[in-house]
């Protein structure tokens, strides 16, 4: 494995030497010597990797080599970047630049000679130890070849909803009955070891038709080992009142009072997933009243947690799969599209498969991981190699004991070992994130690019390919996954046991350090600080270590959000972190609101994230960050922030998020950022709309227009952005009450799938003015006087429509027969003038979810909903009590919704 990491590093180093050959002229002799030693080194790696398991000495050799490759890359890139920074005009600058150039060239030549000598010494030691040269004529797949293969295997995605049901059908039925029909138990607990399927079982119950009809509202919160009381309460309240935008600003006591009152008056189901200790419940319980309106479904590895929460608790012990169920689940993952009519699996392979699943101990997680591993193997010899790898080190069984648990971890480890090197890198980078973190994929893809896993020009596509492969192998869990082209994986997570494997492998490869408490020496010094080039900080108490000299070689620093405040008070905090490629300071508070000027010294940075950070002033030294691919400036600032006009120098940027609130002095020139793919917060108050003309690679754009502009100007500036997939247009508060839709023409954007308009318009544009393949449309504050539905229902690719905040100010709205042929989701919120809504039979035949929120004058639910048999979920929020009384069983309008499995009433008691 280490050989793969070293080879990966060598490949990046060769690319750097080739790419910067012109700027490296003058040190040819030193570089030639380095290249000779690198070639010799590469020929030793395969034999070293084969021998590393039996020798600590060989493992140390490989660690030394990895450090040397990193050091060489740092030296060469620093030289190139300093040379770029020195380029300028004027005689004095030229003289100073020449003197500095000669000094730098002498230093880099000396440094390269030093690295070359160290490599030569390691090679000599390796050869003396008996490591042989192996000249490998093969080659690794190029990025394009990997993507081609990935496109082929994407068609065989397993149906997780189907596979998850293996062996749990009866358990789901029993749990549903206890929650819906039995009032004796306030708390129902699912207990069992990690990986046994507690969360899967709870999820099936949570979404069951009878459960969705029985309760008024639902909340799902993952508690995990490290949590904060406020965060758990906040999440519950957000799920029960999803449209309350003030929850994030509430203090702990306000949340507690509001949540207590809510649970006291309604019939709600709250799922607390992964509660570890009795004490965890004691920290959470204050919001749950004694009155029996709510019910709780709780999952835990500790059977005593549920009984501690409620002495009358019903404890359900999750059971392992039997051998037949294990093989059935494995088959569904290995052959997701095989049906009864197809040729049976080779008998020898089936026999091996059934033998291998016995080593999974009946744990669904291990069975899925094994299935993901075997899905890439198509011959008897390949299956036999997997079987031998499992059987050679463990002896499994069908019951859970220490031995079979070892076999489970062995199978999970084999799934990792089977990954190609680039995917091993992707997987290990997930170790940065705290337990049960929701990982946003757009940030993750840019993070992978900043770490050099793939070329910066293909960030989104490459990231999607790699993540889908990790999901397909059941190493990562994808949330909101849809197997249709217009949807993307929005976020992902890791199962606890898989995360343990990830952390173990990261430690084994000296890949990163996780720092939870700097007073704990074992946390910091578990490995040599000089070799830990990635730090992940999970505690605000760890501040003082950031600028320590022993971290001078750190390349990645990620600060995770935690309960206590994290302050940066030292202006020199970045002085000893000059080799950073990745820096995530989300939610960090900077003293005086100033980002330290020393950040300008981080010239290697590719990724800088300040999301939610308390910052009101950015330094002009940021102009030095010329290699940035990703820059997120979505800071949390109550005051206006000043952004110096330095972003124009970051021409490598692919992702840019600009602060929403900037002072009037901020004027930005962004026209040279031609590599941008994602641009958020673009405002014509601070930037010229014509800057967009050359950004032809843009895929996602959010633009705010001031009173100086109209749609004609905007359309002209967007005309070349033919790769746009998502576009949001907002007019400033001063001007959105003026009709600007006369020149609205977006029909030439053939790739545009998502459109959001916060624009005043008396009527919606004609259907021919819209993009031809539009899938999602969001209309806010439009003030349309004419019914938009006759136009929208003719956009035949639409799958979701949101009308919010007086998008329509008329009284009557009609969805006609044969309209909205593909619509899946409809949200009608805060349409304060709407009185009558007609849905004709044959309209919206594919609708699955419908939300009606705070439409105070709407008289009743449309009668035509009774014809929409596809409807699975109806959310009614903030409507009068009469609505609820009419629509519950026995109510006069119940016939309209009796076919809908999940009908929720939220805040409908006024």
Swiss-Prot record:
Coiled coil (UniProt feature): 15-57
Protein residues bound to ATP: 192-199
Top-level taxonomic group: Eukaryota
Gene Ontology biological-process entries: plant-type hypersensitive response
Example of a GO MF term: ADP binding
UniProt xrefs under InterPro entries: Apaf_helical, LRR_dom_sf, LRR_R13L4/SHOC2-like, NB-ARC, P-loop_NTPase, RX-like_CC, Rx_N, WH-like_DNA-bd_sf
Stretches assigned to the NB-ARC domain: 146-459
UniProt-listed Pfam families: LRR_14, NB-ARC, Rx_N, WH_DRP
Record keywords: ATP-binding, Coiled coil, Hypersensitive response, Nucleotide-binding, Plant defense, Repeat
Signal peptide positions (record): none
Family named by the database record: Belongs to the disease resistance NB-LRR family. RPP8/HRT subfamily.
Primary role: Disease resistance protein. Resistance proteins guard the plant against pathogens that contain an appropriate avirulence protein via an indirect interaction with this avirulence protein. That triggers a defense system including the hypersensitive response, which restricts the pathogen growth. In contrast to RPP8, it does not specifically recognize the Emco5 avirulence protein from Hyaloperonospora parasitica.
Protein name: Disease resistance protein RPH8A
Organism encoding this protein: Arabidopsis thaliana (Mouse-ear cress)
């Amino acid at each position: 494995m280490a050989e793969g990491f070293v080879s990966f590093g060598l490949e990046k180093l060769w690319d750097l030497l080739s790419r910067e050959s012109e700027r490296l002229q003058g040190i040819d002799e030193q570089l030639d010597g380095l290249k000779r030693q690198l070639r010799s080194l590469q020929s030793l790696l395969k034999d070293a990797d084969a021998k590393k398991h039996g020798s600590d000495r060989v493992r140390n050799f490989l660690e030394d080599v990895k450090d040397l490759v990193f050091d060489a890359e740092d030296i060469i890139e620093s030289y190139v970047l300093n040379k770029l920074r020195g380029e300028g005009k004027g005689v004095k600058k030229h003289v100073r630049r020449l003197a500095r150039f000669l000094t730098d060239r002498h230093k880099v030549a000396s440094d390269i000679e030093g690295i070359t000598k160290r490599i030569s010494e390691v090679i000599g030691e390796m050869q003396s130890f008996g490591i042989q040269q192996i000249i490998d004529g093969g080659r690794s797949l190029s990025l394009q070849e990997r993507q081609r293969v990935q496109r082929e295997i994407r068609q065989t995605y397993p149906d997780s909803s189907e596979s998850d049901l293996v062996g749990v059908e009866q358990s789901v039925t029993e749990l549903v009955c206890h929650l819906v029909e039995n009032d004796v138990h306030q708390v129902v607990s699912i207990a069992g070891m990690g990986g046994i399927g507690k969360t899967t079982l709870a999820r099936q119950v949570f979404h069951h038709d009878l459960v969705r009809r029985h309760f008024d509202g639902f909340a799902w919160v993952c508690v995990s080992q490290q949590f904060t009381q406020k965060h758990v309460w906040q999440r519950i309240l957000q799920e029960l009142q999803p449209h309350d935008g003030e929850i994030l600003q509430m203090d702990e006591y306000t949340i507690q009072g509001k949540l207590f009152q809510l649970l006291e008056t309604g019939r709600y189901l709250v799922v607390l997933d992964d509660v570890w200790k009795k004490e965890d419940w004691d920290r959470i319980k204050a919001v749950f009243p004694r009155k029996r309106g709510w019910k709780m479904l709780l999952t835990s590895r500790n059977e005593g947690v549920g009984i501690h929460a409620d002495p009358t608790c019903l404890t359900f012990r999750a059971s392992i799969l039997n051998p037949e169920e294990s093989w059935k689940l494995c088959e569904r993952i290995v052959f997701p599209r095989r049906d009864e009519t197809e040729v049976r699996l080779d008998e020898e392979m089936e026999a091996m498969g059934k033998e291998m699943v016995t080593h999974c101990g009946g744990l669904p997680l291990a069975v899925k991981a094994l299935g993901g591993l075997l899905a890439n193997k198509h011959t008897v010899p390949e299956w036999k190699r997997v079987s031998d790898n499992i059987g050679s080190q463990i002896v499994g069984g069908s019951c859970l004991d220490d031995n079979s648990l070892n076999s489970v971890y062995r199978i999970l480890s084999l799934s990792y070992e089977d990954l190609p090197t680039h995917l091993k890198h992707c997987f290990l980078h997930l170790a940065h994130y705290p337990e049960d973190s929701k990982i946003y994929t757009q940030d993750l893809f840019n993070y992978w690019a900043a770490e050099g896993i793939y070329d910066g020009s293909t960030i989104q596509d490459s990231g999607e390919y790699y993540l889908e492969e990790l999901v397909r192998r059941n190493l990562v869990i994808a949330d909101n996954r849809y197997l249709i082209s217009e949807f993307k994986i929005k976020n992902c997570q890791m199962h606890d046991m898989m995360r343990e494997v990830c952390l173990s492998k990261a430690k084994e490869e000296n890949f990163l350090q996780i720092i939870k408490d700097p007073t704990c020496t074992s946390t910091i010094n578990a490995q040599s600080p000089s070799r830990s080039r990635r730090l992940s900080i999970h505690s605000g108490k760890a501040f003082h270590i950031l600028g320590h000299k022993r971290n001078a070689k750190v390349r990645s620093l990620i600060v995770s959000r935690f309960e206590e405040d994290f302050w940066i008070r030292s202006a020199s905090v970045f002085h000893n972190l000059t080799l950073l490629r990745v820096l995530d300071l989300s939610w960090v508070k900077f003293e005086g609101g100033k980002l330290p000027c020393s950040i300008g010294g981080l010239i290697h940075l590719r990724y800088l994230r300040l999301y939610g950070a308390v910052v009101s002033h950015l330094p002009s030294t940021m102009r030095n960050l010329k290699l940035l691919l990703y820059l997120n400036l979505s800071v949390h600032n109550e005051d206006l922030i000043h952004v110096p006009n330095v972003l124009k120098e970051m021409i490598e940027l692919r992702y840019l998020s600009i602060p929403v609130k900037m002072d009037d002095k901020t004027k930005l020139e962004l026209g040279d950022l031609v590599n941008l793919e994602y641009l958020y917060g673009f405002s014509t108050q601070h930037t010229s709309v014509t800057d967009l003309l050359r950004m032809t690679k843009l895929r996602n754009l959010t633009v705010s227009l001031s009173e100086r502009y109209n749609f004609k100007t905007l359309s002209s500036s967007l005309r070349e952005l033919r790769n746009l997939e998502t576009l949001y247009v907002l007019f400033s508060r001063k001007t959105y009450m003026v009709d600007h839709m006369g020149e609205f023409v977006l029909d030439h954007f053939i790739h545009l799938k998502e459109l959001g308009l916060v624009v005043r318009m008396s009527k919606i544009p004609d259907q021919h003015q819209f993009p031809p393949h539009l899938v999602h449309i969001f209309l806010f504050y439009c003030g349309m006087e004419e019914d938009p539905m006759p136009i929208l229902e003719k956009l035949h690719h639409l799958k979701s429509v949101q009308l919010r905040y007086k998008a329509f100010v008329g009284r009557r709205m009609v969805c006609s027969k044969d309209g909205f042929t593909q619509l899946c989701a409809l949200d009608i919120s805060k349409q304060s003038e709407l009185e009558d809504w007609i849905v004709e039979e044959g309209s919206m035949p594919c609708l699955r979810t419908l939300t009606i929120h705070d439409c105070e004058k709407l008289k009743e639910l449309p009668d035509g909903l009774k014809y929409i048999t596809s409807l699975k979920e109806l959310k009614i929020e903030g409507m009068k009590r009469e609505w609820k009384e009419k629509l519950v069983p026995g109510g006069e309008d119940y016939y309209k919704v009796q076919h809908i499995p999940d009908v929720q009433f939220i805040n409908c008691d006024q």
